[in-house]
Amino acid sequence: MSFVPGQENAGSRSSSGNRAGNGILKKTTWADQTERGNRGRRNHPKQTATTQPNAGSVVPHYSWFSGITQFQKGKEFQFAQGQGVPIASGIPASEQKGYWYRHNRRSFKTPDGQHKQLLPRWYFYYLGTGPHAGAEYGDDIEGVVWVASQQADTKTTADVVERDPSSHEAIPTRFAPGTVLPQGFYVEGSGRSAPASRSGSRSQSRGPNNRARSSSNQRQPASAVKPDMAEEIAALVLAKLGKDAGQPKQVTKQSAKEVRQKILTKPRQKRTPNKQCPVQQCFGKRGPNQNFGGSEMLKLGTSDPQFPILAELAPTPSAFFFGSKLELVKKNSGGADEPTKDVYELQYSGAIRFDSTLPGFETIMKVLTENLNAYQDQAGSVDLVSPKPPRRGRRQAQEKKDEVDNVSVAKPKSLVQRNVSRELTPEDRSLLAQILDDGVVPDGLEDDSNV
């Protein structure tokens, strides 16, 4: 009597047509349907455990269980004594013996052109089956780790049939309680085979006609995700992160300008202000109709650390439409030289209600107090976002410079001359007449009142 994993009290149900003369299952590739897809094509030599290339993607035999993948380099794959045999219903403890076989996976090309080898994946085979069916328990074989339960007799082979993929799906790998998984490894795809198994059982219960249609629907296109593809994508992402993670992203004037232009091209109600495009550039200056935002929040926009707690108060789209008073108003279009277009405003008014039981209530009140009508406190100060002066062309700037060079600049007036409008008194005129040799007061010093 041979045992079948996953079936209670199962007899020998193995398919003799899938066995070679030495009792080993036929070699195949990852997908169960590869052999059917290659019908009519040129036959290639089958790979064995000894001829499998180091970078190959071929799994020589079908394991009853999903694999265990290594994700950290330099880690050793080993289990404590009495541990490491996957558990499956229908297999007694005396037959829980076998080995883990290391499968070397293919390499991939990184963005910088280098080839990187994927870390290996391990598969379990019962003693007397798999790529080393003729080996005895404990033989020193490269890429093989022997495991057995305490009750198993390792001197005899396990009375377990080999898996026929047309009849049995792979079982997600599970271990007995207390088993310690080797560090740097994880169990691969615990639910990868379950959907196919359930759909197959449903198709069998529907009858022969539906069964044929169901099998045709399960055919995978050429672009379907392969088991190794997830690891390749993850490795590419990690390689990219490892290359750029230590380099802080620098914001240049050009990049800031691009971000600002991208934001301003959006409709006004879809803009999100930040450091590159402040609040007043997105929504205009603060005033009675737009009265929220202190100096710091106007500069940082949504990047302000206080903004997320305010965002919790923002209404949802449904609350906006169903909890507000809405009014559709038609506005005048642009000037006479602009094309005619209909412009509308959806004007709204509503309220956001909250009480002191709201988490972060005190912080919310503090932030609201600091930012509501903050423009009134800054009315006498310079605008936070002052418009930049228009750039002068090179020729215009040179002409301006020449004008300045050709003008004789008078000395600045003294404080007395700037602040006091003086009138000459008779005493002043007499004093000046004594100073001047000719005794005549210059016209420039005559009393303004006589002009």
Swiss-Prot record:
Record's compositionally biased regions (Polar residues): 46-55, 211-221
Keywords attached to this entry = ADP-ribosylation, Host Golgi apparatus, Phosphoprotein, Ribonucleoprotein, RNA-binding, Transcription, Transcription regulation, Viral nucleoprotein, Virion
* CoV N CTD domain span: 256-379
Which Pfam families does the entry mention? CoV_nucleocap
Residue numbers of Phosphoserine PTMs: 166, 190, 386, 421
Kindly report the protein's main subcellular placement as a broad class: virion
Location relative to the cell: Virion; Host endoplasmic reticulum-Golgi intermediate compartment; Host Golgi apparatus
Stretches the record annotates as Dimerization: 263-380
Which residues are annotated with the PTM Phosphothreonine?
173, 425
Region called RNA-binding, residue ranges: 52-193
State the disulfide connectivity. none
- The answer to whether keyword Transcription regulation applies is yes
Signal peptide bounds: none
Example of a GO cellular component annotation carried by this entry: ribonucleoprotein complex
**Per the record, where are the segments of Low complexity compositional bias?**
9-23, 189-208
Q: How is it modified after translation?
A: ADP-ribosylated. The ADP-ribosylation is retained in the virion during infection.
- Which GO MF term does the entry hold, naming one? RNA binding
Residues that hold RNA according to the record: 105, 121, 163
Chain spans, region Disordered = 1-57, 155-227, 266-288, 379-423
* Ranges where the CoV N NTD domain occurs: 60-189
Similarity comment:
Belongs to the betacoronavirus nucleocapsid protein family.
Function of the protein: Packages the positive strand viral genome RNA into a helical ribonucleocapsid (RNP) and plays a fundamental role during virion assembly through its interactions with the viral genome and membrane protein M. Plays an important role in enhancing the efficiency of subgenomic viral RNA transcription as well as viral replication.
What is the protein name stated in its UniProt record?
A: Nucleoprotein
Which lineage do the record's taxonomy fields give for this organism? Viruses, Riboviria, Orthornavirae, Pisuviricota, Pisoniviricetes
Gene responsible for this protein: N
